[in-house]
Amino acid sequence: MMEDLKSIIRDIPDFPKKGIVFKDITTLLQDAQSYQRMIDLIAHRYVGQRVDKVVGVEARGFIIGAALAYKLCAGVVLVRKPGKLPSETFSKTYSLEYGTDTLEIHRDAIKPGERVLIADDLLATGGTMAAVVDMVLSMRAEIVDCCFMTELNFLNGRSKLPAGKVYSLLNF
């Protein structure tokens, strides 16, 4: 079943720059049965656990996070680029391969003690998710897991995340 889903994701060579093979998930998302199966398989892992909020990371994490929140009867929290959220925010600046980036979350989005599932489409180097984990922990929430649709194993991004709190449906 996983191989069926993996086969739907197309490789785009030299995107966004030469030497990179981009995993294009849009082919899976636009196929209704495959998208539903992907969400169901990830959600199944958390059925029976208390999940209060699902955090979706801009932008493709919204696609997965909102669907998981619906399946798990949880609220949705958005993590966005600076200036995109209308109320007071916490922000986190983190290092990229070349430079830095910043993410924001509403200050009142997560209450202390809430159990939070963080969702994104892809785990690559782990830098973005590590920043989100720091923000969620600073809000005194408990992380259920960091879950991903896909993971690029050779980049070892999970080493930057809490041990035992990483789940990827499809590994490349």
Swiss-Prot record:
CDD domains: PRTases_typeI (cd06223). One of its GO terms (molecular function) is adenine phosphoribosyltransferase activity. GO terms for cellular component: cytoplasm. Its EC number is 2.4.2.7. The keyword Glycosyltransferase applies. Keywords: Cytoplasm, Glycosyltransferase, Purine salvage, Transferase. One of its GO terms (biological process) is purine ribonucleoside salvage. It catalyses: AMP + diphosphate = 5-phospho-alpha-D-ribose 1-diphosphate + adenine. Pathway: Purine metabolism; AMP biosynthesis via salvage pathway; AMP from adenine: step 1/1. It is found in: Cytoplasm. SUPFAM superfamilies: PRTase-like. The keyword Protein transport does not apply. Belongs to the purine/pyrimidine phosphoribosyltransferase family. Homodimer. Catalyzes a salvage reaction resulting in the formation of AMP, that is energically less costly than de novo synthesis. This is Adenine phosphoribosyltransferase.
